[in-house]
Amino acid sequence: MLIEECPIIGVNVRVWLFWSYLRRPRLSRFLVGCIPVAVLNVFQFLKLYSSWGDMSELIINGYFTVLYFNLVLRTSFLVINRRKFETFFEGVAAEYALLEKNDDIRPVLERYTRRGRMLSISNLWLGAFISACFVTYPLFVPGRGLPYGVTIPGVDVLATPTYQVVFVLQVYLTFPACCMYIPFTSFYATCTLFALVQIAALKQRLGRLGRHSGTMASTGHSAGTLFAELKECLKYHKQIIQYVHDLNSLVTHLCLLEFLSFGMMLCALLFLLSISNQLAQMIMIGSYIFMILSQMFAFYWHANEVLEQSLGIGDAIYNGAWPDFEEPIRKRLILIIARAQRPMVIKVGNVYPMTLEMFQKLLNVSYSYFTLLRRVYN
């Protein structure tokens, strides 16, 4: 199965293949996609460096600068490590094909596949809608304004016809920028969903051990059959652990960047929302905050699900028919239970586990700094 044909990851992989971020890079796609977006981000930093006085303008420019810097880093990391991503996706496609043949796990696989595809497609539509808000907002404010504040040395970007040209270019670049940012979040979410499928498959295999024990006498199976099945469960458990480790290595450092940057931007946007008195600006700030929270929540919620379900592996064994097994098999089951007490975790910068508790702490810190800013401002 080709990676773009794998249903659970196919939506995001096709977007990346279209822009040549996977497999063989094509310079023509880079010249109309990620390279102009990276140049735009440089001009955004120049604008941010030269912005003084207007607090709302500074915060909005800072938000877009950080957002575009984040998506440029995401794409750069993807392109530089594309072989690593391709190998990971090939493993997902191969395992998906095997699980699809398993009648017991197929309903779970199909349910999570539908959920993953719906999440990927809805994220793209949400990104398109928010991006449309980005580029149309300047049309509803007095005076000339660009979707993204930029400074081009030696050029007055608000003078005719430069203003019109830059505006149209920014509208165009919003599309490839959206394709650089959204699929990475969806890739992470769908891959964690696939980890949940594998954990469910392991629990089913462990549950079948009890049925083996109960039918050994009637079918003439020896303890060797049960032992061989247990060895396969051990190997599969180790495979899932390696899968989560590989996924963590692909996202952990970018999650740290988002944790630091968007935590600060959330605080700044809340502050700007509290002092804004224009309805259009308040609506736009609300959409910015919603985008930050939705993307961050997608990361932390799915990572938390993997952690909780991996802890349930030990419960699946303990609730089985392990007292009926022979002592050598019981000892190996204890090893699996002991390993399951160390949950499979995806970490922020390989330091802190990504859990809903961690997400709540991020919100608490952002809100605390917001109240401090508000008090100082008043």
UniProtKB/Swiss-Prot annotation:
Sequence ranges on the Extracellular membrane side: 23-29, 81-120, 186-254, 300-378
GO BP terms: detection of chemical stimulus involved in sensory perception of smell; olfactory behavior; sensory perception of smell; signal transduction
Keywords: Cell membrane, Glycoprotein, Membrane, Olfaction, Receptor, Sensory transduction, Transducer, Transmembrane, Transmembrane helix
One GO MF term attached to the UniProt entry: olfactory receptor activity
InterPro entries: 7tm6_olfct_rcpt
Tissue expr: Expressed in male and female antennae and maxillary palps.
Location, primary (coarse class): membrane
Residues that carry a glycan: N364
Cellular compartments annotated: Cell membrane
Cellular component terms per the entry's GO annotation: membrane; plasma membrane
Superkingdom of this protein's organism: Eukaryota
Induction: Strong response to the odorant 2-methylphenol when expressed in odorant receptor deficient Drosophila.
Ranges per topology, Cytoplasmic: 1, 51-59, 142-164, 276-278
Entry's transmembrane regions: 2-22, 30-50, 60-80, 121-141, 165-185, 255-275, 279-299
Membrane topology listed for this record: Multi-pass membrane protein
Disulfide bond residue pairs: none
Family: Belongs to the insect chemoreceptor superfamily. Heteromeric odorant receptor channel (TC 1.A.69) family. Or30a subfamily.
Chain's role: Odorant receptor which plays a critical role in the anthropophilic host-seeking behavior; establishes the host preference to transmit malaria.
Protein name (record): Odorant receptor Or2
Native organism: Anopheles gambiae (African malaria mosquito)
